[in-house]
Swiss-Prot record:
Top-level taxonomic group: Bacteria
Region (Aldehyde dehydrogenase): 1-333
Pfam families recorded: Aldedh, MaoC_dehydratas
MaoC-like domain ranges (all copies): 537-648
Name used for this protein in its record: Bifunctional protein PaaZ
Source organism: Escherichia coli (strain K12)
Gene name in the database record: paaZ
Cited function: Catalyzes the hydrolytic ring cleavage of 2-oxepin-2(3H)-ylideneacetyl-CoA (oxepin-CoA) via the open-chain aldehyde intermediate to yield 3-oxo-5,6-dehydrosuberyl-CoA. The enzyme consists of a C-terminal (R)-specific enoyl-CoA hydratase domain (formerly MaoC) that cleaves the ring and produces the highly reactive 3-oxo-5,6-dehydrosuberyl-CoA semialdehyde and an N-terminal NADP-dependent aldehyde dehydrogenase domain that oxidizes the aldehyde to 3-oxo-5,6-dehydrosuberyl-CoA. Can also use crotonyl-CoA as substrate.
Phenotypic effect of disruption: Disruption causes the conversion of phenylacetate (PA) into 2-hydroxyphenylacetate (2-HPA).
Length: 681
């Protein structure tokens, strides 16, 4: 039997000594031996730090984003290899899609976020300038820099691809290498994907390592520049979190654990409403997808007391139609658990719930002697959920959920929160007031809550689907950690530092001009410069323009804006302005007339306007002038040879009056041509 090799220190290595076996979930056949005994974990970490970390830190965010996109495209081209291996885990094609293509999709999402929202630099200014002095000579910004260590990702068995990729994406975008430690039961699928990434040559040497087997003494060798993430059981995560070296060196530890997630039926819903059918469908889908082996799966079904039997009957009727078996056979809707060990664990947890007072409405007993690790869809009923703590603390990690009655909506809220912290929850209701109250009271114990009704159902991504744009994690039992959430996740792999100094020094450090920093003026209008020629701080001070009552009248007639402060002399005199004032949007238009270079040149288009603030009113007779300054530049990747190479330039605009008082502050974005393209076929 072949051993599943690890990829450490840039080479594929086999362990020695005691090994565990990976079995086929359907046939029970032994497929792989897994061991990492004898492998040098300290050397593996050092290799990642010496090779992978410097290479990734040297890349800009834009370059890292491009790397993510390239890896995603490569993995997508090889997806059928992964689907074939995924069948060994008992998953259906639909189950595997979530894991394989869902994981690859997360790479694409982070590639897009990085290219659109992060600077073309290795430093990430997190906020705008923070003034710290009266005259403006001393200020600060928070900057994010890549940690110099390695991210250790300890992952669960249920999503061997997505579980790795959803962590790799923000890790690499943040500039850190990763050591992946997958769960043994499905490590062959993770290994295949890692091998594909390594063989592609798309990532720097040392950017990714893989441990098939135990992590050994790896955690003992980490220091404060390293990061550890864990996905798995709450018990294991709590044990690792207090590992002496992690505690002693305050090593960041992010934990995402299984939880007793709930689905609540609002008291406004009756069996003849569309929401009732949606509720049944959502629960059944979450019970049977991946054979219930999801950390976000619905475990507790909370319904009004009067609807218990109606809900139970509807769930049983639908669950009885679920065909369980080998996913390779036509018509099979639910596959097996990952192995016989997991099947025995689910049976044990079901027995605990039964001993605590729950009743079987469907299923409940697996054939523990069968070769395939099948477990039937199981619906339990807990008649007294307030007196049965086991139902809020015992998770059968399979196609098992427990129905329980709520006396009223307040009681339903209490039961929803009784899980002690959950990754996800769903409320099915058509009543906005019920939804608001549920969020107000239950959100504090949940990482994500879906409000499902007829209006949202058609496009809903579902109760159990973590999305890369949204946070994934939860308080309490769910681990107290947070993954994904768009760019929030990237910050877990970076150090935030408050940097103080003069505005000019802060601008030089961040490569972004800030208000108060020195500017550079020359005889060439900034709009006549190509993207490569522009530098943050390049500036233009425009001629002046005096505003008149005729301007106000003409703009009002042209725009249709006859607001009294502009057109009614008497009403305006009694307003906070004391007299008629110029339209704010005319001030912007006049400002554009002052700073725009009208001829054909590198500036292609106005991309948008941001952060507009009107500081002081402009009155007839006031004279305005504009300072236009290049604030930051963002390269746009050229997607084809035919596409014009461009970049986005953000300009700081300050409009001030004859007293040098700012009257309007804002930023404009322009699409600017580049002199040279970068497309590579």
């Amino acid at each position: 039997m072949q051993q599943l090799a690890s990829f450490l220190s840039g080479t594929w290595q086999s362990g020695r000594g005691r090994s565990r076996l990976i079995h086929h979930a359907i046939s029970g056949e032994a497929l792989w031996e897994v061991t990492s005994e004898g492998l040098d974990m300290a050397a593996a970490r050092q290799f990642a730090i010496e090779k992978g970390a410097p290479a990734l830190r040297a890349m800009t965010f834009i370059e890292r984003a491009a790397m993510l996109k390239a890896v995603a495209k490569h993995l997508l081209s090889e997806k059928e290899r992964f689907y074939a291996l995924s069948a060994q885990t008992g998953a259906t094609r639909a189950d595997s899609w979530v894991d394989i293509e869902g994981g690859i999709g997360t790479l694409f999402t982070y590639a897009s976020l990085g290219s659109r929202e992060l600077p073309d630099d290795t430093l990430w200014p997190e906020d705008e300038l923070i003034p710290l002095s009266k005259e403006g000579g001393f200020a600060a910004r928070h900057l994010l820099t890549s940690k110099s260590g390695v991210a250790v990702h300890i992952n669960a068995f249920n999503f061997p691809c997505w579980g790795m990729l959803e962590k790799l994406a923000p890790t690499w975008l943040g500039g850190m290498p990763a050591i992946i430690k997958p769960a043994t039961a499905t490590a062959q699928l993770t290994q295949a994907m890692v091998k594909s990434i390594v063989d592609s040559g798309l990532v720097p040497e040392g950017a990714i390592s893989l441990i098939c087997g135990s992590a050994g003494d790896l955690l003992d060798h980490l220091d404060s520049q390293d990061v550890v993430t864990f996905t798995g059981s709450a018990a294991t995560g709590q044990m690792l979190r207090v590992q002496p070296n992690i505690v002693a060196k305050s090593i960041p530890f992010t934990m995402e654990a299984d939880s007793l997630n709930c689905c609540v039926l609002g008291e406004d819903v009756t069996p003849d409403q569309p929401e009732f059918a949606l509720f049944i469908r959502e629960v059944v889908r979450e019970m049977t997808t991946k054979a219930g082996q999801k950390c976000t799966a619905i475990r507790r079904i909370i319904v009004p007391q009067a609807l218990v039997n109606a809900v139970s009957d509807a769930l049983v009727a639908r669950l009885q139609k679920v065909v369980v078996g080998d996913p390779a056979q036509e018509g099979v809707k639910m596959g097996a658990l990952v192995n016989a060990e997991q099947r025995a664990d689910v049976q044990e947890k079901v027995n605990i719930l039964l001993a605590a007072g729950c009743e079987i409405r469907l299923g409940g007993q697996a054939d523990l002697s069968a070769a395939g690790a099948f477990f039937p869809p199981t619906l339990l009923y807990c008649p007294q959920p307030d007196e049965t703590p086991a139902v809020h603390a015992t998770e059968a990690f399979g196609p098992v959920a427990t129905l329980m009655p709520a006396q009223n909506q307040r009681h339903a809220l209490q039961l929803a929160c009784a899980g002690g912290g959950s990754l996800a929850g769903t409320l099915v209701t058509a009543d906005p007031q019920i939804a608001r109250q549920f969020i107000a009271d239950a959100a504090r114990t949940h990482g994500r809550i879906q409000i499902l009704n007829e209006e949202s159902a058609k496009e809903s991504t579902g109760h159990g689907s973590p999305l890369p744009q949204l946070v994934h994690g939860g308080p309490g039992r769910a681990g107290g950690g947070e993954e994904l959430g768009g760019l929030r996740a990237v910050k877990h792999y970076m150090q935030r530092t408050a940097v103080q100094g003069s505005p000019t020094m802060l601008a030089a450090i961040s490569k972004q001009w800030v208000r108060g920093a020195k500017v550079e003026e020359d005889r060439i209008h900034p709009f006549r410069k190509y993207f490569e020629e522009l530098q943050p701080g390049d500036s233009l001070l425009t001629p002046r323009r005096t505003m008149t009552e005729a301007d106000i009248v003409n703009f009002a007639c042209l725009s249709g804006d006859h607001f009294y402060a502009h057109m009614d002399k008497i009403a305006a005199a009694e307003s906070i302005f004391g007299e008629r004032v110029v339209h704010g949007y005319f001030v912007l238009s006049a400002a554009a007339g002052l700073f725009v270079d009208a001829g054909v040149g590198p500036v292609i288009a106005n991309y948008g306007l941001e952060s507009l603030r009107f500081i002081e009113p402009v009155k007839p007779g006031d004279t305005i002038q504009v300072r236009l300054t290049c604030k930051r530049k963002t390269l746009k990747k050229q997607r084809s040879a035919e596409e014009k190479p461009t970049g986005v330039v953000e300009w700081a605009v300050e409009v001030f009056n004859q007293h040098q008082t700012p009257v309007a502050l804002y930023s404009i974005l322009t699409l600017v041509a580049r002199q040279h393209g970068d497309f590579v076929d």
